[in-house]
């Protein structure tokens, strides 16, 4: 196993001791392949978090060595994560894998995600229709503080799904209050 990959797994092993995560991966192209539709991450691990599935990407950070394209040694490289309520499902749904991959593609092409950044995607493909998800807010993963990794500082950004009404509230200036409420309440960090 490679140093960066092992490091990400170790971060989550602290949260889920003894678990072997499920892994989902799309066919990938080499990182220098800039064609549209190319997978931006090498896969997504899924952990059983009790009442939720906890997804984390693998590949936005340097997994094998420090690439020329990565941020400098003082920057923070981040993987994306998402906690999705189980909704009585015995197996984790795949729509979060696709959603995280889509957002990872934007990040790998230069989009910036940081604490309290929200964005509208339109209806999220595959998500339960009754959830009404149309976007997300980015938070620093509360359970995993950024720390030195093998190729620089590594953090995890938690994406929390938002409804159209929540996104409208944010657009109308209610972002600080809503995002603070989500950040302060682990139950509201489930999508």
What is each of the regions a protein language model found here?
Residues 1-191:
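Short linear motifs embedded in intrinsically disordered, proline/glycine-rich low-complexity segments
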């Amino acid at each position: 196993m490679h140093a960066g990959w092992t490091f990400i797994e170790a971060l989550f092993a602290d949260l889920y001791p003894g678990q072997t995560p499920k892994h989902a991966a799309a066919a990938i192209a080499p990182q220098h392949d800039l064609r549209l539709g190319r997978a931006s991450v090498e896969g997504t691990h899924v952990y059983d978090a009790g009442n939720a599935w906890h997804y984390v990407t693998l590949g936005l950070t340097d997994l094998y060595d420090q690439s020329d394209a990565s941020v400098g040694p003082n920057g923070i490289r981040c993987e994306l994560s998402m906690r999705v309520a189980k909704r009585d499902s015995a197996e984790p749904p795949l729509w979060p894998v696709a959603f995280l991959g889509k957002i990872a593609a934007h990040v790998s092409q230069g989009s910036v995600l940081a604490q309290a950044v929200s964005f509208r995607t339109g209806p999220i493909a595959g998500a339960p229709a009754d959830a009404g998800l149309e976007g997300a807010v980015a938070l620093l993963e509360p359970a995993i503080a950024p720390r030195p990794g093998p190729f620089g500082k590594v953090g995890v950004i938690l994406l929390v799904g938002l409804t159209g009404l929540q996104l409208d509230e944010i657009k109308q200036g209610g972002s600080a209050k809503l995002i603070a409420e989500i950040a302060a309440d682990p139950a509201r960090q489930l999508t």
